[in-house]
Amino acid sequence: MGELPKDDWQMNRWKWDGQRFEAIELQGESLQLSNKKGLDLNLPCGFNDVEGTPVDLTRPSKKVRSGSPGSGGGGGGNYPKCQVDNCKEDLSIAKDYHRRHKVCEVHSKATKALVGKQMQRFCQQCSRFHLLSEFDEGKRSCRRRLDGHNRRRRKTQPDAITSQVVALENRDNTSNNTNMDVMALLTALVCAQGRNEATTNGSPGVPQREQLLQILNKIKALPLPMNLTSKLNNIGILARKNPEQPSPMNPQNSMNGASSPSTMDLLAALSASLGSSAPEAIAFLSQGGFGNKESNDRTKLTSSDHSATTSLEKKTLEFPSFGGGERTSSTNHSPSQYSDSRGQDTRSSLSLQLFTSSPEEESRPKVASSTKYYSSASSNPVEDRSPSSSPVMQELFPLHTSPETRRYNNYKDTSTSPRTSCLPLELFGASNRGATANPNYNVLRHQSGYASSGSDYSPPSLNSNAQERTGKISFKLFEKDPSQLPNTLRTEIFRWLSSFPSDMESFIRPGCVILSVYVAMSASAWEQLEENLLQRVRSLVQDSEFWSNSRFLVNAGRQLASHKHGRIRLSKSWRTLNLPELITVSPLAVVAGEETALIVRGRNLTNDGMRLRCAHMGNYASMEVTGREHRLTKVDELNVSSFQVQSASSVSLGRCFIELENGLRGDNFPLIIANATICKELNRLEEEFHPKDVIEEQIQNLDRPRSREEVLCFLNELGWLFQRKWTSDIHGEPDFSLPRFKFLLVCSVERDYCSLIRTVLDMMVERNLGKDGLLNKESLDMLADIQLLNRAIKRRNTKMAETLIHYSVNPSTRNFIFLPSIAGPGDITPLHLAASTSSSDDMIDALTNDPQEIGLSCWNTLVDATGQTPFSYAAMRDNHSYNTLVARKLADKRNGQISLNIENGIDQIGLSKRLSSELKRSCNTCASVALKYQRKVSGSRRLFPTPIIHSMLAVATVCVCVCVFMHAFPMVRQGSHFSWGGLDYGSI
């Protein structure tokens, strides 16, 4: 072990080249990326930006923790001080333990101390402060650590199996040579599964391959014990998915004197399941178990229906179906065919385990991987076996599953193949392999979205299934400083990733050396790295002297591996309950050099120990949180009132990462750096991260919306392209590929980003321009495939169409790419498409105003596959105004004049739109007012009081009666009859 450095290195003394992975020591200079660095954020929300503060969930062991002195708080030059409020104890001369954890000796032993305006106590095992409520009275360790300690004392250690084997051997000293052979075979199995480093005195030596073959020859004829046969039968019945199927093994056969299945059959299934390293042994097992006549006679179960069968081709072999469901071989198959199909089926749907699998076997495609997690019995990430991981226990007592497991279960329920419902058989507490026993499971994971990766570029949707997935790999190098990193570090990491990365960018920060590498790879490459991390770390150590002599941690997604003194340990399952999750950062794009306010939204952002940083130009800068908000929708908000990115390049394009971490665990979000116009366009994407009509239940759902993953993929790809704008391609990785340009161009057109599409086209032309000043054939074929101009016409985006039509590869040569006459499928051109689209007068005007006047001259002559011209398309769709517009332009061109279409002194089209919008607003206003008054009237129920209505009715009745009486001819005693017609007029 090397000597510990005297002082932890400081950020302002080093300049890190994130592209070359090289460190340059500065002389009297300081590299500042932000106006906020080295901040000690003692906020109530739990932020404390002290780089040396340990996080118990990320360190695999107390012995693997950093031995270097504590940093000065994120790169500052001050010596560390005690983090207790009002404690000014200088820790520069204190012990290394107190310097690392920022606590003086007095407060580390005190029963209570005021930290962050809260009374807390220093935990001796966590090496951090907790609230007093987390401690039992008088205890120096928190209850969580004490519970783990008690569980470790009661838990059986992994070496107990070897001890039991030795005890069994010592106890049965009178056993015959056959039992000794069995013990030797079990010892070989244990050693083959990664436990050969822990040999116990007195245990039998590991037999060689020839000895194993001899042992198999001896014990292949041994019958299985009756109790083991019944146990296999019972587990097979429990694992069967269809309960109506008959039992594969009749228990009455044993009572009738039928011979039990041969031990050879069990070993054959075992070898097929575990993947024997000896090809001769596999051939021997398959031939001896299924091709040999004597073995078949011993294996065949007694049946009255087949007692007369003597031919080997007619023999019916029956074996209990451990995967659920009885399976009987067909009598029409030859022995060799049956053996091949039987072995293939066994390897794909049978997982017969004696012990937990070796980590080396996890990379085999036909062997399932065992579950690794942080053991409650140890702080080291080791491979543990838990009773709850048994498939039978999971079948009876299902636990809370992750979204990926739920997707797999849904897929498994809809499958009709009996092989997908297999259940592994565990004889000695083997860990769960059910998740990977299904051969379609890996295919399902690659088709699911996170990786976040994939696209068929089918318009108009923004799909990202085939795109590169951007992820982060973190290394923590103990007892190192930047000067000790080799110059070949980038090459070693690139080769370690099997040359899969399309892009890589690195950042470093103190805490020994925390090296963060952002990598763009395919989803399948990420899956291989996470599933085979142990083998990958082993290959990294073997191929590099620097890594073999280093003590380090590596975090790749869901797994954490550690290397110390040549030993590699792996933890596959982390406790993800309190992991931070960044949903979005607002704004999504910023202008370099301009100060802006930043809002970070996500989940679990205010937990204890979280740190907010900005990664840019190879280094980290701490960010000061000025406000926080914890909503009822489980979405937290962190506010950064003053955020500024300083660009070291004159080019205003780039990308940085906003990181929220707790040790090596955390989440990140890309932040685009561009000019003001592009930033304004990209910031419109925030609506897709915060839909206004999303209800609380949807926000709380752990499955994030698909659109978020698609937009995130778009931002990551755009960030990689912008980063290459100011970095030279001298590192050996391939240039930005055409499929990646294809994805960005389609997304930009579908989102109506005119400024962004021009910038992306400039970068594509710059990389694919030939010596003759023209684009190469591959680029032209790609542009013809995605048909950007047709997409703009479908969206009726006239501004985007004008941008594309006037775009030239070289302005001096006027070499235009997007012509209005370029033919697509069926010889359909943009002119035909626009002519058949309604309300596209502006689009027709733009297409016929191209710089070369191709659209105007081809309107009446350009035909498609059916012989129709754009003029015919417009006439068939009753778009006669299009033909009138083109005819007027042609007449003006012939006469050398310019005509203006003025109707009633104003633009009729614009007027109709404005009037319709105003009328619509007026109608809406009137409707709302009418509804308001209607509600008021309906609330009072009567317009007038009841007495007034009665009086009016009485007066009206009297008036009607008088009028009727006067209009009739009543009989009067004196005088003539009165009639209305006899009345005259005159003065009164």
From Swiss-Prot:
Question: Which spans does this entry mark as compositional bias, Polar residues?
Answer: 250-262, 301-311, 327-358
GO cellular component labels: nucleus
InterPro entries for this protein: Ankyrin_rpt-contain_sf (IPR036770), SBP-like (IPR044817), SBP_dom (IPR004333), SBP_sf (IPR036893)
Motif Bipartite nuclear localization signal location, chain numbering: 139-155
Could you list the residue ranges that cross the membrane? none
- In this chain, Zn(2+) 2 is annotated as bound at C123, C126, H130, C142
Q: Where is this region: Disordered?
A: 52-79, 240-262, 289-416
Key words of the record = DNA-binding, Metal-binding, Nucleus, Transcription, Transcription regulation, Zinc, Zinc-finger
Bias type Low complexity, positions: 368-379
Please state the residue ranges covered by SBP-type zinc fingers.
79-156
Q: Which cofactor is essential here?
A: Zn(2+)
Q: Does the keyword Protease apply?
A: no
Q: How is the cofactor bound?
A: Binds 2 Zn(2+) ions per subunit.
Q: Kindly give the Pfam families that the UniProt entry links to this protein.
A: SBP
GO MF term list: DNA-binding transcription factor activity; transcription cis-regulatory region binding; zinc ion binding
**Composition skew (Gly residues), residue ranges:** 69-78
List S-S links within the chain: none
Record: residues binding Zn(2+) 1: C82, C87, C104, H107
**What is this protein identified as?**
Squamosa promoter-binding-like protein 16
Q: Which organism is it from?
A: Arabidopsis thaliana
By which gene is this protein encoded? SPL16
